Amino acid sequence: LKNIRFLEAAGDDPIIVHQHSIGGDWAEGMMIYDAITQCQCHIVFVMHGAACSMGSIIPQAADTRIIMPNCLFMIHDGSTNLDGTHKQVQSAAQLEEKMRDQMLDIYASVCLNGHYFQKEQATDKSVRQYIINRMNEKEDWWLNAREAVAFGFTDAVLGDEGYDNIDSIRDIINNEGE
């Protein structure tokens, strides 16, 4: 969070974030997500190795999402440990439902632009249901880099036309501003 704010204050150059993440805490991840969405600079997110759980949500905030050819992408409901009184557990379960809805909103909004869902002329509701069905099938929905692009979770695989390397991505972004 501090680094994004520092780089934003330093100028309007694109910010390139490299991430390898098997996941993490919901609140901390959403803090990063919010910082990215509020940043005035163009943010490019490059996923390496694994983008799982919260590590697959955070990149959705970026302006450009690139995945490395061998990076794995995974979405799921996450895990929860509940402890406390009956009412506290009920309250926590209700919060989990709200977080799930927020996660589905984020994924559905980006997936609508994916080749798979454009071909199907999908709606927000049908995309949400598709994602729910995939998670219900196996709990964890794993995708390779090409599948992540096809479903709209990422914009391109590094090495694709126009995304040959990080420098070419930087050039594209800089030319957009001219």
Language-model regions: role of each:
Residues 1-56, 60-178:
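N-terminal organellar transit peptides
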